Amino acid sequence: MKSSRYNYFAADDGKIICLNGVTGNVFAISEDVFPLLKDILKNPNDQIYDANLYQSLYNLHFLIDDDLDEIDCLRKRYQDSIKGSLYKLIVNPTQECNFRCWYCYENHVKGQMNNNILERVKLFIDKIIARTDINSFELSWFGGEPLLYFKEIIYPLARHAQCKAEKEGKSFWQTMTTNGYYLTPDIITFCKETRLTSVQITLDGNRELHNRTRNEQGKPSFDRILENIINFCRSNIENEVILRINYTKEVIEAGLKEVFESIPDEVRPQIRVNFQRVWQTVGIEKTSEALMEHLKYIKELGYPLVNNTAFDIYRGKQCYADMLNYANINYDGNVFRC
């Protein structure tokens, strides 16, 4: 046996946190016992300690077989993660948006996907779904605000893709990133009919702070968006909302308890909460402890978290843009990886 090259150790309040970077296995031991652990990992073949210790470390991947090439294993894991029978296509119907959030990186170019490009996207979808190596097709909507052109772009393209997938016997579903303002009852019905079961919607803090940042020419949007989120969840038990909270120090200090307490209990399991710091404040403001308190409380209320408070590591691809079977088509016909 030999020691894994991906064993890491960190001191923490009289304990040593031990992590294996390949498996994500982690445990803590006292500082007094750490020299013994280091000796075992340095000389694993001496077998001078209890055999159960060696077996436990082997099971946790801290000790590995002599002929195991960990780098080769990681390469294979990555290759397996970017391949597959799923094709993910993101379409941006427009770069326009009805909001003007101060931190937004988009350029809000006016214009929508024209009919010529729309028909070419349909042909592309037909070609992808017909491939024998593709079993599943995910159509995802982004922008700008995609629902600005629901009737012109989303409705015909989604119906076309769904029909083609059903004809070919392939799995089909949709996802969307939207500000949620135009997620009306009619569109929610459409979502149910076309398997659009997951949406990401953002709140920028409590009602006051959100309306200060996310408004339609001064008109508040908080109550309308929150109502749309609840209606979307209630329309289909399979529906999921990734509720992104763009936060700054001001958002955290102002508190969010009232926001999460106001959402009915029965839909909370369908709402996955994802806190993301506004990128212009990264490294400037410190909110770690207060953020952890929010996460713990929100979890107690029955919401699943995207920001899991448990430790985890990436295994395989870092992002869907790493996938081989993926593309992003912009409203003007340009195709991007990211």
Sequence positions of predicted segments:
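N-terminal [4Fe-4S]-dependent radical SAM core
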Residues: S3-A28, A51-I90
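Accessory C-terminal segments flanking Radical SAM cores
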Residues: S3-P35, V306-C338
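Short acidic, hydrophobic short linear motifs in intrinsically disordered regions
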Residues: D32-Y49
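Alpha-helix C-terminal capping/helix-coil junction sites
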Residues: Y58-N59, C233, K299
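Conserved glycine-rich "GG(E/T)P / GGGxP" loop and the immediately following alpha-helix
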Residues: I90, T94, N107-R277
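Local cysteine-cluster metal-coordination motifs and their immediate loop/turn environment
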Residues: E96-E106, R337
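Flexible glycine/acidic-rich beta-alpha junction loops that bind and position SAM and/or redox cofactors
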Residues: E208-R212, Q270-A290, N308-Q318
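Glycine-rich, aromatic-lined ligand/substrate-binding cores of catalytic
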Residues: M292-N308, D332
